[in-house]
């Protein structure tokens, strides 16, 4: 992910449970428990490495979703992110596909989804 503000981006993703070290330069990466690696590069570094690089335009430049431990955790995570000063795109709702869902916006205007499976209704 290319970021305009490394420290603010790290602060946001820590609220979502990403265990990431404090940034010390223009590149940072974190390995999630599943083995997926998230990597950040400062906008200044990218412009230095690729002078012709242009920032992507439009909505949903990346697709990133974090699974929460429960429907209540979706609500709590959304509230924690918003309370920390970040924006909500859409507050928690029960989606027709069987998940509790919410959308928040990271410091670089990427929409990040939060979700958890809803309990299966009993007859």
Residue ranges of predicted features:
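A generic structural signal for ordered alpha-helices
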Residues: 8, 42, 52-55, 59, ...
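Short linear motifs in intrinsically disordered
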Residues: 16-21, 69, 92-94
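Core segments of cupin and vicinal oxygen chelate
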Residues: 1-47
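Short amphipathic alpha-helices in soluble, non-transmembrane regions
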Residues: 11-15, 77-82
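Vicinal oxygen chelate
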Residues: 1-4, 23, 29, 31-32, 38, 52-123
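A short, acidic/glycine-rich surface segment
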Residues: 46-52, 121-123
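N-terminal beta-strand motif that seeds the catalytic metal site of vicinal oxygen chelate
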Residues: 1-11, 16, 61-66, 116-123
């Amino acid at each position: 992910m290319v970021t305009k503000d490394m420290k603010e981006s790290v602060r946001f993703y820590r609220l979502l449970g990403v265990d990431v070290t404090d940034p010390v330069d223009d590149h940072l990466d974190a390995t999630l428990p599943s083995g997926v690696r998230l990597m950040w590069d400062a906008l200044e570094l990218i412009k230095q490495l690729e002078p012709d690089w242009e920032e992507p335009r439009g909505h949903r430049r990346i697709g990133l979703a974090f699974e929460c431990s429960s429907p209540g955790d979706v609500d709590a995570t959304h509230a924690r992110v918003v309370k920390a000063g970040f924006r909500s795109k859409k507050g928690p709702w029960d989606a027709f596909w069987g998940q509790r869902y919410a959308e928040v916006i990271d410091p670089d205007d990427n929409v990040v989804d939060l979700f958890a499976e809803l309990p299966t209704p009993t007859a």
